[in-house]
């Protein structure tokens, strides 16, 4: 039997889960009872839950996958990255300037895209759980399946907790009532309980790109690390305890092996979004969004054998110079003359000027084409196109080490922090100072995780988010979370706007 979702129910789902363009193939019909009764069918269902991690292209997110906007949003409101307007390019209604200046409003498309991305993933998981409920599998067989799905759903809710705070908790596929806000504390408690309840039933082994115990421990560690920022409660020791439960991973000897095209063999990656252009999945666009249009000439001497690039995101002034020249991680950015592989000369831009990346920018509102140091963390090579095969890294073992180091410093035990941060810094060729303090930890986080879509959260935790920097003044405290998108509020009158933002 198939349950056909009526137009009214589908419309309800659209605003219940934040107005997302649900994939018609996935959501116009839900099998009831006749599907999900074999291992192969269950694997297909659970595999479908992970596909939403890649995001989807739509008009709201300018035809770039929505997952990219989640990471852009966390970067361009931080002290790390910016998307300056260059002539008439990258203005897009001022959404990037507003993000950098911390003057965003509830109609910002990046904010809407981040909301929709997470709730689309949640909606799909709710539908799959509903389908498994109706299957003929035994309750015991269903336990690990439910655990995996609910832990993955908790990952999306963690993102919403971090970004928006007071969001609706939607878990019942059949419930078409318009939801109300949950408090940030309620969302926090929900994420913690979902992960804690799931852990005993999750796979204890390291399984690439799947929701395992190690991934759940890592998300809980993040939750406890940011607990003070989220709910005003310090849980540093709980963060350490979760980190110590993560096993089976190690730092790769070469930092950049985590970002090569075939990075799925890394011993360091705990959780990632898998991409495969041959399979037709949306690729990792991070480098492409950053490099100049003519960067292609530095990648391949053969015409039409290089990836396209958009000349968008770049590092803010001061980020590149924060790295010592001996720091191996500094190569994650491109600075200076870009050389044409075919001619051996400096690449020229279309305006006749040399493509020489500079750290400084004239302004956020009118930057030159070559201004801003560019992202080069993920491998770029000839033969690739816009969509790439690099799996997007979400959690690395380096983060597990750095969380422990930070928490020990915050607990007043910097000597206990040293061996953890030592592993990370030594790989980069960096020596530690005599005393490990929070200022050093903050800088080390900047350098280790540059352009990995997490800097905003660090800024908030260290308090720097609210201080003036390159292109912004002092930030109001309420902007630690984003507004609920205006289109969501229009569609669901039961929702209230986050404090500080106009309705």
Please report, for each region that a protein language model flagged, where it lies by residue:
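Conserved, well-structured interaction surfaces
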Residues: 39, 43-47, 51-57, 85-163, ...
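Long, intrinsically disordered, low-complexity segments
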Residues: 18-21, 88, 115-121, 184, ...
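Short coil/turn linking the two alpha-helices of tandem helical-hairpin repeats
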Residues: 159-163, 168, 206, 226-233, ...
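An aromatic- and glycine-enriched ligand-binding surface/loop that stacks and positions planar moieties
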Residues: 20-90, 192, 196-197, 210-357, ...
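Flexible, polar/acidic helix-loop-strand segments at domain edges
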Residues: 87, 91-103, 321-396
